[in-house]
Amino acid sequence: MKQGFTLIELLVVVLIIGILSAVALPQYTAAVEKARATEVVTLMAQAERAADMYVLEKGYPASGLVELVGDNGSKTGKLNIDIEAALKCTKGDDVCVSKDFAYDVYCDTSACHWSAGRNNESYVLSADRSRGGKWERSCYYNDKEGKPVCMGLKGQGWSIDGNE
């Protein structure tokens, strides 16, 4: 008596594995992207608090703007958190660039602003706080990959805008 699998049995197993991976991979990718966005939201909440402390201590700039992150040598000590280390930045001028995002935090004469743009340009998270106001957060998506990330933030007080 012969033992083993027939060609048909092997093909059926390969087909089932293919179907399962075709269904699971997009769900996995979406979950990973939402996790990245959640990490950014958490880190940028620290940036909001740090920018608020900066304004309380030094006030809004009289003219122009003050970059609060980056690595051009002039921003050291502007924030009371080591945001560049937390975001794992590489050297850059006015922005902090990590593996997945490019960050910018600054204050000008009337407001503070932060943004975190996904390096593949599928979505951008940003927030603005004018004098005496509160942080207004928004998420803008450019494609199908960014849309679920922004929609996941909708119920948390974020305004959503997109171009799919």
List PLM regions with ranges:
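Conserved hydrophobic/amphipathic alpha-helical signal-anchor segments
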Residues: 22, 30-69, 79
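Periplasmic/extracellular, small/polar-rich flexible segments of pilin-like filament-forming proteins
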Residues: 57-164
